């Protein structure tokens, strides 16, 4: 499931949305199998490896939705726990940074500001979450890390925009 979800995120960055959807569909099928197989084994169902798999699945689904400008799926729709969903939401911020950096390299700034705003919004939502660490599986650390990711991205975007303006002015002079 983690492999499918990770491959889906890579497909999103290659702009292969159909492949990403297929991979996430496969991951979703495995998730339903896991839920069915472990339904009578609560301790295993709530073990860390299931949480990690759900988190990766959430990250893939959220990243695909945000980049493709689709409605954000909720944890109920994905069939995962709230804690896994929030962790996946936090992890998607790093994928949005990658999307922005890839866009800057392609000199396509059309959605960079929008994605930075989305990153800020995710951070704002995660700041309001107050789960015990036992349930949140590192969400507080993820939230703390996100702030730095956003600020580095903001700096990279600002430098790129300023360089673009400088280049345009130099072309006007030349």
Residues covered by each model-derived region:
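Long amphipathic all-alpha helical oligomerization modules
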Residues: 109-174
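Short helix-adjacent coil turns
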Residues: 12-19, 104-110
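Long, charged all-alpha helical bundle/coiled-coil segments in cytosolic proteins
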Residues: 21-79
């Amino acid at each position: 499931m983690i492999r499918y979800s990770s491959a889906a995120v890579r497909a999103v960055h290659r702009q292969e949305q159909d492949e990403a959807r297929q991979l996430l569909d496969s991951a979703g099928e495995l998730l339903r199998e896991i839920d069915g197989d472990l339904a009578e084994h609560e301790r295993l169902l709530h073990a860390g490896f299931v949480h990690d798999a759900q988190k990766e699945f959430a990250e893939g689904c959220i990243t695909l939705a945000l980049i493709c400008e689709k409605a954000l799926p909720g944890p109920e729709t994905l069939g995962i726990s709230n804690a896994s969903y929030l962790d996946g939401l936090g992890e998607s911020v790093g994928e949005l940074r990658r999307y922005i950096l890839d866009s800057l390299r392609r000199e396509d700034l059309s959605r960079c500001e929008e994605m930075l705003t989305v990153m800020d919004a995710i951070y704002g939502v995660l700041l309001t979450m107050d789960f015990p660490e036992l349930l949140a599986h590192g969400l507080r650390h993820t939230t703390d890390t996100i702030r730095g990711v956003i600020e580095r991205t903001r700096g990279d975007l600002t430098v790129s925009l300023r360089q673009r303006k400088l280049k345009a002015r130099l072309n006007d002079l030349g």
